[in-house]
Design a protein with these regions (language model features):
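Ser/Thr/Gly-rich flexible loops in soluble cytosolic domains mediating phosphotransfer, phosphorylation
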Residues: 64-88
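Single conserved hydrophobic/aromatic residue that forms the stacking wall/gate
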Residues: 222-232
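Surface-exposed amphipathic alpha-helices with a cationic face
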Residues: 57-60, 114, 210-217
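Acidic/glycine-enriched edge-of-secondary-structure segments
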Residues: 7-29, 109-113, 166-169, 194-200
Length: 232
């Protein structure tokens, strides 16, 4: 089969599309980015946001399958696709970088967020060893990993494995206790720790969490040829 992939509203690596690509390549299909000058047996279209314009042109394919929050919250990947290692070549992702989730869902019910309606309460999803698949840098897109005991166990495993991570959706600063701060200070972060700050009322919580983590020795160290130029 000739498979086309179309991301409507984002250039950011789309995990679902990468897994779909892996699945079809594994069964011998040809997979490529959709080209309107070509014809396809099937085209997968992904849309992240409900407020962005849809693809408005004719799709030259026998079958068209649309997915993503931009089209609705009910459709999910088939289990045999969901557990595939993503096809990182689709986006020319660095060979040492992986993307994924450790948990899905969130216990909060923020009025602006679709996650609870789409994924429900927080549940275990994948192990960091599965997600990283031997890669040393991992972008984790969990919505509230600190709200899960499983998530905290996974952070401990991240530390023991020595992988570098970025929870790019932000951590919930309100959940940072003394013990969690000590744990987070041991993680090898890609550039920085991110905290979600969706309302002005959360600024104080972010400052409190930052101070706690700083207490346990988390710092950024810029190394230059001269020891005198090293700064925190």
């Amino acid at each position: 089969m000739n498979i086309g992939i179309l991301a409507v509203d984002s250039n950011y690596p789309n995990l679902a599309l990468m897994k779909i690509s892996s699945y079809h390549k594994a069964i011998g299909d040809n997979v490529e980015w959709y080209n309107p000058l070509c014809s396809y047996d099937k085209v997968y279209i992904a849309k992240v946001f409900s407020f962005t314009p849809d693809y408005g042109y004719y799709i030259n394919a026998d079958q068209v399958e649309k997915g993503g929050t931009g089209y609705g919250i009910k459709k999910v990947l088939l289990p045999e696709i969901d557990r595939m290692i993503p096809d990182y070549d689709l986006y020319n992702v660095d060979k040492n970088l992986a993307y994924g989730f450790l948990t899905r869902g969130c216990p909060n019910r923020c009025k602006w967020c679709v996650v609870p309606a789409k994924e429900g309460n927080i549940t275990p999803y994948m192990d960091i060893a599965e997600v990283s698949a031997g890669r040393k840098n991992v972008i984790l897109m969990d919505n509230n990993v600190l709200a899960s005991e499983y998530g905290l166990q996974q952070i401990e495993k991240i530390i023991s494995m020595g992988v570098r991570v970025d929870f790019n959706q932000g951590l919930d600063a309100r959940l940072v206790t003394d013990d969690i701060a000590r744990l987070l200070a041991k993680v090898k972060w890609i550039k920085r720790i991110r905290f979600g700050c969706d309302t002005p009322g959360q600024i104080a919580e972010c400052e409190r969490a930052t101070a706690l983590i700083d207490k346990y020795g988390y710092c950024l160290l810029y190394t230059s040829p001269s020891p005198r130029d090293r700064t925190r």
